[in-house]
Amino acid sequence: MRIIGIDPGLARVGYGIIDEIEGKKIMIDCGIIETKSTQKEEERLVEISNDLSSIIKKWNPNSAAVEKFFFYRSSTTISVVQARGVIMMTLGKYKLPIQEFPPMQIKLAVTGYGHSDKNDVLNSVMHELNVTSPPKPDDAADALAIALTGIYLK
């Protein structure tokens, strides 16, 4: 099984690719899709879709896991929701089964405690994937946690 985890955003979209082979989880790749604040919003959304398409074509995941939000209050959050919609559309274009998880469920799945802090999540991700240095930037590490949640809760 190969899964892509995605941490949605407009400025930075984190992604993480993990293989699960006979119960062992192996980090294949992680990183970010970054857009510039000087671009028009529609240009940023197109860039996210195009870059995500390239990542999907390169790594050919079997499924996807995406962070899900419940509250939309600020204009910044609305932009993130728009980016998330583009991400969902792009995943759908490749017919990837999509799992969606709220932040508390991701923390619970990865650390065993739904109110864990970022360091606890990061340490759990590093331990599970047997990596010695933290995945950078934080958005990529978060995406790996989302991918692990997709594996644990499949």
Swiss-Prot record:
- What's the main place this protein lives? cytoplasm
Q: Does the keyword Ligase apply?
A: no
Specify the species.
Answer: Prochlorococcus marinus (strain NATL2A)
Name the cofactor(s) required for activity, per the record: Mg(2+)
Q: Which InterPro entries match?
A: RNaseH-like_sf, RNaseH_sf, X-over_junc_endoDNase_RuvC
Q: Assembly and interactions?
A: Homodimer which binds Holliday junction (HJ) DNA. The HJ becomes 2-fold symmetrical on binding to RuvC with unstacked arms; it has a different conformation from HJ DNA in complex with RuvA. In the full resolvosome a probable DNA-RuvA(4)-RuvB(12)-RuvC(2) complex forms which resolves the HJ.
Q: Where, by residue number, does Mg(2+) 2 bind?
A: 67
Q: EC top class, in one word?
A: hydrolase
Write the protein's name: Crossover junction endodeoxyribonuclease RuvC
Q: Which gene encodes it?
A: ruvC
Q: Please give the catalytic activity noted in the UniProt record.
A: Endonucleolytic cleavage at a junction such as a reciprocal single-stranded crossover between two homologous DNA duplexes (Holliday junction)
Q: What is this protein's function?
A: The RuvA-RuvB-RuvC complex processes Holliday junction (HJ) DNA during genetic recombination and DNA repair. Endonuclease that resolves HJ intermediates. Cleaves cruciform DNA by making single-stranded nicks across the HJ at symmetrical positions within the homologous arms, yielding a 5'-phosphate and a 3'-hydroxyl group; requires a central core of homology in the junction. The consensus cleavage sequence is 5'-(A/T)TT(C/G)-3'. Cleavage occurs on the 3'-side of the TT dinucleotide at the point of strand exchange.
Record HAMAP family: RuvC
For the ligand (Mg(2+) 1), the binding residues are 7, 139
Q: List the GO cellular component terms.
A: cytoplasm; Holliday junction resolvase complex
Higher taxonomy: Bacteria, Bacillati, Cyanobacteriota, Cyanophyceae, Synechococcales
